[in-house]
Amino acid sequence: MKHLLGMTTVAVAILALFACATRTCAQGTQTQTQSQQQQQPPAQEGQKPSLQNPITPAVAPVPAPVDPKEDAAYKSFFSMSPANPADVDKEIQAGEDFLKAYPASQYLQHVYSRLANAYFQKPDLAKMYEDGQKALALNGDDVSVLTLLGGTLPRGKADDPNFKDKLAQAEQYDKHALELLPTTTKPEGVTDEQFTKLKETATMTAHGGLGIALFREGKVTDAVPELEKATDGVTNPDPTDFYVLGLALASLQKYADAAKAFDGCAQLTSGLQDRCKQGASDAKAKAANQLQPPKI
């Protein structure tokens, strides 16, 4: 399993399933909007807006029908399943071509969401961030993008002049994703087993991203429970989550627990293995020399 910036490419592929990838989803949104518009009574003169009585135009605009060529291009883009870097480049090109051809498409949010994932896999993190932001501007509840950005931004370089702001964004994205995940509905074409694994991966990534963001913001005590949730009992834990958990626990002088976290990281194939082995060795040595409270 290949790890990219501490996040598995497998995890991102699973998270992409949360993105609405079929015409049915977009049509469902359009149909629901039209239904709500038909049911909404005309605004009465003198009424004041409120949650119970929002003021809306007497005749709500009806979305334009989808151009058959646009629909075909959208389907073609979402039917792509890249298996190698060349395929990822083709997927990105198809998405960019769609945006140029249909800049006002009702499918824009879904295309930006898919492109954000594709740019992560390339990897082109600047474009991932740019398209992810555009996707969230159109739908702030896109769990795929929330988790992607929330899991990736905390792993950025500290010398980025905007890094502090990105950490705050990541914290916000991960918290919102964790709010949405318990009630997220199963996408079409996904089995119950796949959906269970999908939610587990998304939840793990959100907790891990939040924990790393908190750790790098200096909120070490708050970071520990998030990183523990990201690593405890999950099927495919992220070695970076284990590693940062070890660092956090060691900084709190909980050396025995830190050694366990580093050991968890050392057992996973990644570029962090040597550092985790050393971290485990150092933590065990400090734990052995640490004064223990007297037994009662």
Where are the language model's segments positioned?
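TPR repeat positional signature
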Residues: 73-76, 112, 146-149, 153, ...
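Structural motif corresponding to the intra-repeat A-B loop/turn of tetratricopeptide repeats
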Residues: 85, 122-123, 156-160, 164, ...
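Short solvent-exposed coil/turn linkers within tandem alpha-helical repeat scaffolds
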Residues: 101-108, 135-143, 161, 182-201, ...
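Terminal, low-structured helical/coil segments at or just beyond the last alpha-helical repeat
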Residues: 34, 187-188, 200-216, 225, ...
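N-terminal leader/linker segments that initiate helical-solenoid repeat arrays
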Residues: 24-110, 293-296
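Residue-level recognition of tetratricopeptide repeat
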Residues: 117, 151, 155-158, 212, ...
